[in-house]
Amino acid sequence: IDTGDKSVEEQEKILEFDKFADIARKDAGGILVDGKSSGIMYAYAKCCNPIPGDPVIGYITVGEGIKIHRKTCNNLINLTSIDPDKLVAVQWPGTDGTLFVAGLTVKGEDSPGILNDIAHTIVSYRSTNIKSININTNDSTFEGSVMVYVNNLEHLNILIDRLKKLRGLYKVERFEGT
């Protein structure tokens, strides 16, 4: 993992995201190329860090197999303009009803009951199951991550919108790599 000239805090966040992404991808199973499982070598692009549920597409590379990108990845858009013939259809395995692990970053004012409020807001929407919660406090603020099982990106986005309405939370966003 390349952490370059990043601070210890930034390095910890990179490691935390990589751990999350590994769990989410392992839970989802292998990528399907042209609709079927295969022994084709592939890797996830670090530029956009796709996770299960993201619309994805593959880009054939030399020596690294197929790189899996989010369809909205700026780097992929640039690569496609150079050589569009290297694109290949890929998708996450599973069918409707499949649950994906998704991660959220939360920040806010530390107050009694805030963790309960976060958990209740999550489980009260479609009985969403929580995989893990990790919250750290510093003086009167907290920061942490929440991993949840969601059906799709719409499910995740609705959870984010619901959490943003909680008093005391001033940041709720999808867990992204840095």
Question: What kind of region is each of these model predictions?
Answer:
Residues 1-115, 124, 131-136, 152-155, ...:
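N-terminal non-catalytic structural scaffold regions of very large proteins
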Residues 66, 142-149:
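A generic structural motif
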Residues 120:
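Extracellular/lumenal glycan-associated surfaces
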Residues 139:
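Cationic-aromatic interfacial patches
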